[in-house]
């Protein structure tokens, strides 16, 4: 309008993103729930303190949808530290259990926020309102199958059918504060700063060579690289696109995108 106001304000993306370092989280499996809850609380703080007035559509989406994207990094680094080959059956089993755990605790935290602060706009029309979004977890809980993966989660409370059913009922009764909770951001440079492998992606080289501005050539060895872990740090080309796609397919619990590069 001529006065600078808007007849209609749509909803655009507000990227409130953060990532957990899988290797750090798995040092204390019994505290996975606490780590996820704290991460969601931190991202919620970003949502609540963000107001981009210059772009009304972003401000509108942030206020009404409260989208956050909790991601993960250092999957390849953690698997190598445990003697597990990226894309193997054990690796895919770990990914399945880990990301189901993250989803459970993220949803639980969002439900607690909604209990006191209300649900995101459109919750009543979502699959969470009628329980269909979580129905599969009540029939097929994502639990460890092998002794190897079960040992990695020793001490952690892994939700069973009853836990998922209880959470499903609580969400239907109380709602969800966030419209979106989980993502898998690419975390390129962020991973290097954290001493981690990028996102849930395989490394492009056991020792990566990068050019960093005025620093020139910089060498980044994979985290924890030594004689024992070297065989598990096959680069993305040697690992192959099939293992990469299988890994991303196992992460079926995210609410946002799964960006990846299929190296062929």
PLM features: residue spans?
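Function-dense linear segments that define catalytic or interfacial modules
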Residues: 1-62, 72-82, 196-197, 203-222
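Internal maturation/activation junctions in enzymes
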Residues: 35-59, 67, 84-187
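Catalytic alpha/beta core of large soluble enzyme barrels
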Residues: 43, 47-49, 119, 153-162, ...
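Structural beta-strand/beta-sheet cores of well-ordered domains, especially the beta-sheet scaffolds
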Residues: 11-18, 66-77, 82, 109, ...
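Alpha-helix initiation and N-capping motif
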Residues: 10, 14, 19, 29, ...
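Generic alpha-helical scaffold signal
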Residues: 11, 33, 37, 69, ...
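Generic alpha-helical structural element
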Residues: 6, 25-28, 32, 64, ...
């Amino acid at each position: 309008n001529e006065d600078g106001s808007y007849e209609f304000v749509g909803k655009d993306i507000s990227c409130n993103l953060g990532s957990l370092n899988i290797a750090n989280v798995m040092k204390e499996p019994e505290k996975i729930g606490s780590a996820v809850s704290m991460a969601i609380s931190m991202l919620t703080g970003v949502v609540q303190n963000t107001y981009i007035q210059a772009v009304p559509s972003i401000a509108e989406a942030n206020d009404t949808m409260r989208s956050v994207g909790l991601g993960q990094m250092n999957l390849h680094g953690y698997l190598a530290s445990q003697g597990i080959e990226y894309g193997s059956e054990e690796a895919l089993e770990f990914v399945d259990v880990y990301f189901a755990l993250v989803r459970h605790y993220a949803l639980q935290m969002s439900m607690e926020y909604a209990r006191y602060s209300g649900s995101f706009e459109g919750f009543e029309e979502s699959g969470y309102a009628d329980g269909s979004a979580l129905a599969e977890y009540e029939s097929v809980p994502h639990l460890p199958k092998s002794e190897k993966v079960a040992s990695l989660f020793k001490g952690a409370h892994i939700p069973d059918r009853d836990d998922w059913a209880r959470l499903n009922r609580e969400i239907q009764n109380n709602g969800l504060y966030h419209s979106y909770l989980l993502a898998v951001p690419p975390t390129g440079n962020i991973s290097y700063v954290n001493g981690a492998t990028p996102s849930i992606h395989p490394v492009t080289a056991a020792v990566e060579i990068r050019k960093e501005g005025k620093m020139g050539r910089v060498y980044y060895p994979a985290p924890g690289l030594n004689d024992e872990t070297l065989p598990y740090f096959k680069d993305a080309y040697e690992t192959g696109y099939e293992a990469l796609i299988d890994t991303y397919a196992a992460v079926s619990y995210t609410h946002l995108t799964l960006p990846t590069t299929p190296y062929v």
